[in-house]
Amino acid sequence: MNPAEHDEAVSQFCAMTRARPDEAQEYLATNGWDLEAAVTEFFAEQDETAGSSEPTGQPSAKSSSSTPRESSSSRKQPPKKFATLGDLASGAADSSDDDDDENQDFFAGGEKSGLAVQNPDDLKKKIIEKARRTQLPASDDSEPRRNYFTGPARTLGGEDTPSRVIDTPSGPAQPQIPRRVRRTLHFWADGFSVDDGELYRSDDPQNAEILNSIRQGRAPLSIMNAQHGQDVDVEIKQHDEKYVRPKPKYQPFAGKGQRLGSPTPGIRAPAPSEPAPAPQSSSGPPKPNVDESQPVVTLQIRLGDGTRLTSRFNTTHTIGDVYDFVSAASPQSQARPWVLLTTFPSKELTDKAAVLGDLPEFKRGGVVVQKWQ
């Protein structure tokens, strides 16, 4: 390769790994200027560094913290602004020795067995410190391209060629990769919470294990609301005050509704055809006794189930006669309490002795509505 090709390979290596030019030249020279092999070796060494085990935290480990820890693969990376769970895991081993003399452990267990749990407040400080030293890498994940045209197809035919249907090609279903999600980790004076969730108190040793998992780059599925194998970006927010339960978010079109056309809710039933003023038949509802020689008014009655009835009454009939007619016409009215009322303005008709001709709403007929109680 000529010098121009070498410079091009170094530029591509730096763009893919964010390494310095001298590091890129070293990896490329080691792998015979094979760009793919050099990049593979670079990321493999980064994974080995991130997966290194943490010290046990014993007092004897304090002396070993003075020994050089930098290897040929742990090269200085450009400063970052945000942190992911993987970045927190890669920096966990580097800072554990420095904090051994400040760790305060909790102990949980019985008389003959116990478990040492690290202080949650100390874990919160470590997570925040590593988030300040790192940044979120540029996401290479792109949303899967949506196919808007699915299903069978049909070809256009002509005079000599008929149209034909092309079925959907059957192939192996591709596994769907869950999309990267973002969660907000809130640190409060008395614990921590995720997004708008409940408080995890600092004095609970079990919650310290959750923080330790986050510090090591593992997202607990129980509190992160994520799927197995799903990438999670964690944004850290620190609060000086104690936990305050967030107010519920306003959701429009939530709760119960009431259908239009009736002052009472109910299930709309198909409205039967209005009976014509004809002699009573055995199939229709019972009709009140009407004296044709006396003034007659027509009342439209809207039942609570949506059914509409029309009946003729004399002006000498009472509200009680209307109650009797509704009770006889609707079997459902005999099983639950109800009341009749007028419309616009709505007023309950509780005086069953009132005469229709004496009520201004019914002197010339009107509408009566049944309301369930």
Swiss-Prot record:
Query: Which branch of life, at top level?
Result: Eukaryota
Write the protein's name.
UBX domain-containing protein 1
InterPro entries tied to this protein: NSFL1C_SEP_dom_sf (IPR036241), SEP_domain (IPR012989), UBA-like_sf (IPR009060), Ubiquitin-like_domsf (IPR029071), UBX_dom (IPR001012)
Q: Where is the composition biased (Low complexity)?
A: 60-71, 85-94
Q: Where is this region: Disordered?
A: 39-179, 236-293
Respond yes or no to whether keyword Transport is given for this record: no
Q: Name a Pfam family for this protein.
A: UBX
Taxonomic lineage of the native organism? Eukaryota, Fungi, Dikarya, Ascomycota, Pezizomycotina
Among its keywords, does the record have DNA repair? no
Q: Where is the UBX domain?
A: 292-369
Composition skew (Basic and acidic residues), residue ranges: 121-132
Q: Can you list the disulfide-bonded cysteine pairs?
A: none
Q: Which residues form the signal peptide?
A: none
Family matches, as CDD domains: UBA_p47, UBX_UBXN2
**What segments bear the compositional bias annotation Polar residues?**
49-59
Q: What is the stated purpose of this protein?
A: Involved in CDC48-dependent protein degradation through the ubiquitin/proteasome pathway.
Any one GO biological process: Golgi organization
